From Swiss-Prot:
It comes from Exiguobacterium sp. (strain ATCC BAA-1283 / AT1b). Keywords: Amino-acid biosynthesis, Histidine biosynthesis, Hydrolase, Methionine biosynthesis, Multifunctional enzyme, NADP, One-carbon metabolism, Oxidoreductase, Purine biosynthesis. The keyword Amino-acid biosynthesis applies. Pathway: One-carbon metabolism; tetrahydrofolate interconversion. This is Bifunctional protein FolD. PROSITE patterns: THF_DHG_CYH_1 (PS00766), THF_DHG_CYH_2 (PS00767). Gene3D superfamilies: Leucine Dehydrogenase, chain A, domain 1 (3.40.50.10860), NAD(P)-binding Rossmann-like Domain (3.40.50.720). Its EC number is 1.5.1.5, 3.5.4.9. It holds the Pfam family THF_DHG_CYH_C. It catalyses: (6R)-5,10-methylene-5,6,7,8-tetrahydrofolate + NADP(+) = (6R)-5,10-methenyltetrahydrofolate + NADPH; (6R)-5,10-methenyltetrahydrofolate + H2O = (6R)-10-formyltetrahydrofolate + H(+). One of its GO terms (cellular component) is cytosol.
Length: 278
């Protein structure tokens, strides 16, 4: 029976250290400030942003959500980003994705100053991460790495990543490679997925397909991190057959309550990092 990794508990512990750092910054007259841009009325986006607001308030970060109708033009959004880039009191800028179809997401991401890119999506920050340089790391991959470190040593382990998205799959493999793991990527064109996943000491699944990974695809004693979030018959489930796989793995993250809390916590970490540099 696997250890169930309580992402809420791990995140709460990490936020305590962030609270201390924020208190020290405030004592020096520095108030970490995060600006979040929310466009449209997507329920999931509104839920994520509420979670970010609560976390910021708990830690002592001054957060402000700027809400706009989905009719906002790309130029108006880019002009707003320019203003926030120029505002020395703003440490972190986050534009909640997805954006309306008439707005180019990549152009928006690239417009945010790399120094204030607390999502860790700007190509400059991604490039630094690839090179193993100090930078603002993407929040979900960073959270996954932290969760894994609470369970095992990373160096020398075989990490198999299922999924190759720009937000999770690609960067998380690179973070583990930077920690001296051996990393294998799998995706929709992988010939025999089960053959690959059974080799994993650490299996990270980030596809968005409920029940993709079954117990016969997991090596006994593996650490399994499930990043998928899928709604099935009114409840949230991951990409892993949780009930079956937890009988075989050494540790596993649940959905919900696993990776999600760490994503928001690492966003707070990045905001504090930027404020500390100033």
């Amino acid at each position: 029976m696997a250890v169930v990794i309580d992402g809420k508990q791990v995140a709460a512990s990490y936020r305590e250290t962030l609270k201390e750092r924020v208190a020290e910054l405030r004592a020096r007259g520095i108030v970490p400030k995060l600006k979040v841009v929310l466009i449209g009325d997507d329920p999931a986006s509104h839920s994520y942003v509420r979670g970010k607001e609560r976390a910021a308030e708990e830690i002592g970060i001054d957060s402000q959500v700027l809400r706009f109708d989905e009719t906002i033009s790309e130029k108006e959004l880019l002009d707003l980003i320019d203003l926030m880039n120029a505002d020395e009191e703003v440490h972190g800028i986050l534009v909640q994705l997805p954006l309306p179809k008439h707005i180019d997401e990549s152009r928006v991401i690239m417009r945010i100053s790399p120094e204030k890119d607390v999502d860790g999506f700007h190509p400059e920050n991604v490039g630094k991460m690839m090179l193993g340089l100090d930078t603002l790391l993407p929040c979900t991959p960073h959270g996954i790495l932290h969760l894994a470190k609470t369970q095992t040593e990373i160096a020398g382990k075989h990490v198999v990543v299922v999924g190759r998205s720009q937000i999770v799959g690609k960067p998380v493999g690179m973070l583990f490679l930077n920690e001296s793991a051996t990393v294998t990527y799998c995706h929709s064109k992988t010939a025999d997925l089960g053959e690959m996943t059974r080799q994993a000491d650490i299996l990270i699944v980030a596809v968005g397909r409920a029940g993709l990974v079954t117990s016969d695809m997991v090596k006994p004693g593996a650490l399994v991190i499930d990043v998928g979030v899928n709604r099935v018959e009114g409840r949230l489930v991951g990409d892993v057959d949780y009930e079956a796989v937890k009988e075989k793995a050494s540790a596993i993250t649940p959905v919900p309550g696993g990776v999600g809390p760490m994503t928001i916590t690492m966003l707070m970490h990045n905001t504090v990092e930027v404020a500390s540099r100033g």
